[in-house]
Amino acid sequence: MSQIHKHPIPTAIAEHALINPEQYHQYYQQSVQNPDEFWGEHGKIIDWIKPYKTVKNTSFDPGHVSIRWFEDGTLNLAANCLDRHLAERGDQTAIIWEGDDPNQSKTVTYKQLHHDVCQFANVLKKLGIKKGDVVAIYMPMVPEAAVAMLACARIGAVHSVIFGGFSPDAVAGRIIDSNSKLVITADEGIRAGRAIPLKKNVDEALKNPAITSIKNVVVFQRTGNASYWKDGRDVWWHDLIKDASVDCPPEEMNAEDPLFILYTSGSTGKPKGVLHTTGGYLVYAALTFKYVFDYHPGDIYWCTADVGWVTGHSYLLYGPLACGAITLMFEGVPNYPGVNRLGQVIDKHQVNILYTAPTAIRALMAEGDKAIEGTKRTSLRIMGSVGEPINPEAWEWYYNKIGNSKCPIVDTWWQTETGGFMITPLPGATELKAGSATRPFFGVQPALVDNLGNPQEGAAEGNLVITDSWPGQARTLFGDHERFEQTYFSTFKGMYFSGDGARRDEDGYYWITGRVDDVLNVSGHRLGTAEIESALVSHPKIAEAAVVGVPHNIKGQAIYAYITLNHGEEPTPELYTEVRNWVRKEIGPIATPDILHWTDSLPKTRSGKIMRRILRKIAAGDTSNLGDTSTLADPGVVDKLLEEKQSMQAPS
């Protein structure tokens, strides 16, 4: 790969940073050598009703996996995100809402949000929702989604947020698995100018005869287009809050009481309901938010994630609100109505901290300077990346173009199951390398092991595991602790297995190489797909690439690359040869793609992740069972790829 140089900590950042390099090392050493002392102190970042005496009580032992933090303490999450800020910053903005339509935006203060949450919490009680009941939330990106989540937390109900892009079948499956008692939705959502039929999807989902627990559907009016209405079951949000009291004392919750279930796709079988509890999760979300984004009071923070993903839970809502931050919620997409929308939103709201995904960055990068046309983005101080490894070229483009070459990028590695950041730079403490997640956060003990579980010391590559618990860790899979142990703790005994591979360089920095099932073995050489993709995307004519392995009778696996070119570029035989030589030059002959498949679009989930499972099957010609495609943003892409594959005559 291209020569990696370090980006030093900018002086302007170092002067005001919350954590400097010395503090990072000191805190980190304390956090791994004496976790009780470290977390005992830092657990105080939030307010406790009954303070904890026990800090950590955890085991990764086979057959006895048990994770408990602050287990004798009590608290309420909503009180931490709202009530405790009222005296000092009740009139400060809590949420800036930017609509899909650039002419629509509004602000919600902490006082207003508190009022709305208390009111809606009383609505939930009136509908028969009790502490411990599960509430399904299938909402667009509007402040009311946050109100619904916080209202659940206020009364001790468990929320299960379902991303607004999921199909009726996916919604039904999640309602059944979690035994939800209520659904909260909207008539429609709006995204990139198009209406999303949320209520219609819920109606469809509830036709499933296995759903018997739902008595009511609360409907928020977003567009005014609700087609079907079932009297007695469906109730309007605005009607319910009319006479609801605004007085709702927060429920006292044990630290280990469930807070939310969030479904994540497994590599096999049905989605897994990842369960997070209240105390450890909020401590971890708040602490990671504060230090990783170097958040200072008054900063305007924008996380582009949907509330339906863990990033939306931890870093759009709970982490920021627990810290009394100003958080921007965006209904739209970064390239609508124009490709410079991201920059326009930054300028309009004077955003200081931006947190987005490589898939968005690459989409803008393909547009070149059009993506920043007419925008200044000078308010930005810190930028972040989440969702998948960011290739160095996209990192540099993001750094130079969006951030005007002055904003540190926090490239965060974490998962739904981890609750918060695991490996990440800290702006005032970490020199950066493009494409590296750098070093572990406090209390996180990563290790690299070979396939037999032997630790790899020094600069090495291997399976990424975590050797001890941290407060934000998921406690179980809802209703299936056996699957929890099987999935995360059975591959390498006594360790949490992330499912990702990584390499550690001579500076101790971690580089995520992609899912372990995305590792190619070509003639006995291990190659991470992320590395080959980075090489491809560094070619000036390539916008996006996805690499998979296909069976090869001599090499074991051949390298099959799906490639999307920048606008205005056309595939030619010359370019085919040029691209193969380019990768050979960047990585070496062993990494040269055997087959290039030109395509306009890749199959992505609605959170922007490329569905490699489908790409592997298409590449191998195994199209009999492509599995569940309901989570794809555009299921039509699959047929298009199959047609392209049929008509392809790969040059020999």
Swiss-Prot record:
Molecular function (Gene Ontology), one example: metal ion binding
Binding-site residues, CoA: R191, A192, G193, R194, T311, N335, S523, R584
Family listed: Belongs to the ATP-dependent AMP-binding enzyme family.
EC number, as in UniProt: 6.2.1.1
Keywords for this protein: Acetylation, ATP-binding, Ligase, Magnesium, Metal-binding, Nucleotide-binding
UniProt xrefs under InterPro entries: Ac_CoA_lig, ACAS_N, AMP-bd_C, AMP-bd_C_sf, AMP-binding_CS, AMP-dep_synth/lig_dom, ANL_N_sf
Positions contributing to ATP binding: G387, E388, P389, D411, T412, W413, W414, Q415, T416, D500, R515, R526
Catalytic activities: acetate + ATP + CoA = acetyl-CoA + AMP + diphosphate
PROSITE patterns: AMP_BINDING (PS00455)
Any GO BP: chemotaxis
Biological source species: Yersinia enterocolitica serotype O:8 / biotype 1B (strain NCTC 13174 / 8081)
One annotated Gene Ontology cellular component of this protein: cytosol
Binding residue positions for Mg(2+): V537, H539, I542
Cited HAMAP family: Ac_CoA_synth
Protein name: Acetyl-coenzyme A synthetase
Protein function: Catalyzes the conversion of acetate into acetyl-CoA (AcCoA), an essential intermediate at the junction of anabolic and catabolic pathways. Acs undergoes a two-step reaction. In the first half reaction, Acs combines acetate with ATP to form acetyl-adenylate (AcAMP) intermediate. In the second half reaction, it can then transfer the acetyl group from AcAMP to the sulfhydryl group of CoA, forming the product AcCoA. Enables the cell to use acetate during aerobic growth to generate energy via the TCA cycle, and biosynthetic compounds via the glyoxylate shunt. Acetylates CheY, the response regulator involved in flagellar movement and chemotaxis.
Origin: domain of life: Bacteria
Needed co-factor(s): Mg(2+)
